[in-house]
Every structure is written in structure tokens, then in C-alpha cells.
Amino acid sequence: MPLYEHVFLARQDVTAQQVEELTTRFKGVIEANGGSVGKTEYWGVKSLTYRINKNRKAHFTLLNINAPAAAIQELERQQRIDEDVLRILTLRVEEHEEGPSAMLQKRDRDDRGERGDRGDRGDRGDRGFGGREDRPRRPRPTEESHGGEEEV
């Protein structure tokens, strides 16, 4: 059976619990049509680049699916009917990635906290270069230095 990565966006005003219920319902649709869902990832609420149906944010969820095309068509049909789902994207892939997806890794990297102070290194200051006023002025270009053609 073909492998798919499926991402859907749920409205910002639904709770994370309701998104889990949606995910469970969509898994049931896939399994009822002879497929299986390998991995699910909830990426959380993220800001959208542009508004979709008056929503500025959305819950993002990824499903790794192993199912026939008919199951995917039924899943997408169910999601188009559901008012809580804003957008869907299904991609056919050669193989599923092992481990967390790039979005989940990015979120983990962002959760590592502040960098802290500079310790004994002190303030960066001017780094020994001085200000602009310390630099010598550039010579003004002359007519000869433009490389223009001479008039005959």
C-alpha cells in the first residue's frame, strides 16, 4: 500500500483535547477503509502566515498513513465536511521518516531556554574597531577613474 504524510489544521478556538478526538476519529476512518496510521504528532498551536477563515492561528497535526487511495479520499472528504478543520495536505512519500519530524525537532530546539549571560567575557563593546569617525574618508571618484570614453 502507498505511504502518505497527512497534515491537517484545526481551528484555534478548539481545545487540544478536541484535536485529539478529531485525530482519533480520522484514524478510525483510515482503519475502517483498510489502512493504518503509523505515527501521529501534535505540533501545537502555531501562527498562520495569513488568515484562513478569519483564524490567525491553528492546531497542527501530522499523521503518517499506510493506506489505499480510497481511504485517503474518504479521509479528505470527511475533513472537508468538518467545520473544525481549516486546511489539509496529503503527500505521497516513498518512506516514512523515523523519529520526530522536522517541525517537532524545531519546537524542541526552541524550548531550550535563554542563552544566559556572557559570564567572564564581559560586554562586547566596540571590539577594537573604533567608530565611523575614526575611518579615513574615501577619495572621491574623478572623471578619469570612471573608465568612460574620451570625447573625440
Swiss-Prot record:
<comment type="similarity">
    <text>Belongs to the bacterial ribosomal protein bS6 family.</text>
</comment>
<dbReference type="Pfam" id="PF01250">
    <property type="entry name" value="Ribosomal_S6"/>
</dbReference>
<dbReference type="InterPro" id="IPR020814">
    <property type="entry name" value="Ribosomal_S6_plastid/chlpt"/>
</dbReference>
<dbReference type="InterPro" id="IPR000529">
    <property type="entry name" value="Ribosomal_bS6"/>
</dbReference>
<keyword id="KW-0689">Ribosomal protein</keyword>
<dbReference type="GO" id="GO:0003735">
    <property type="term" value="F:structural constituent of ribosome"/>
</dbReference>
<dbReference type="GO" id="GO:0070181">
    <property type="term" value="F:small ribosomal subunit rRNA binding"/>
</dbReference>
<keyword id="KW-0699">rRNA-binding</keyword>
<keyword id="KW-0694">RNA-binding</keyword>
<comment type="function">
    <text>Binds together with bS18 to 16S ribosomal RNA.</text>
</comment>
<protein>
    <recommendedName>
        <fullName>Small ribosomal subunit protein bS6</fullName>
    </recommendedName>
</protein>
<dbReference type="InterPro" id="IPR014717">
    <property type="entry name" value="Transl_elong_EF1B/ribsomal_bS6"/>
</dbReference>
<dbReference type="InterPro" id="IPR035980">
    <property type="entry name" value="Ribosomal_bS6_sf"/>
</dbReference>
<feature type="region of interest" description="Disordered">
    <location>
        <begin position="96"/>
        <end position="152"/>
    </location>
</feature>
<dbReference type="GO" id="GO:0022627">
    <property type="term" value="C:cytosolic small ribosomal subunit"/>
</dbReference>
<dbReference type="GO" id="GO:0006412">
    <property type="term" value="P:translation"/>
</dbReference>
<keyword id="KW-0687">Ribonucleoprotein</keyword>
